[in-house]
Amino acid sequence: MNRFDDAGKLLLRLTIGILLLMHGLFKLANGIESITALVQAQGWPAWIAFGVFIGEIIAPSLLIIGVLTRAGALVIVFNMGLAVYLAHSSQILTLTKTGGWALELQGLFLMGALVVALLGAGRFSLGGSHGRMN
């Protein structure tokens, strides 16, 4: 294994975790009415919207500290997939004015979390590289 692998895992975990946590903290401070409306438009109960806090506060926090990292990453993958389905499905094949994919942020969060789920936390984590909670 390359001596920089664990540093790369840490950097990826911190990047995905911190950036997504910022979105969750914004929703915590400003409310989730728009998400509740999206959920109810699907005919689902409004309480499902509170799951955003699991996907954007709890799971990113797990990535940041490196405990239950793979589970937290899979929660983020599910959360982002649901966000694309509920709020962005009409943009899946859309490009921006500058030629980028309209869902590049969601795609980066989803795929970055999937990579974390596959690789684990690494040794720079509370769970340790071979810990049961990695």
PLM region spans:
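Extended, low-polarity transmembrane helix blocks
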Residues: M1-A29, A46-I54, I58-N134
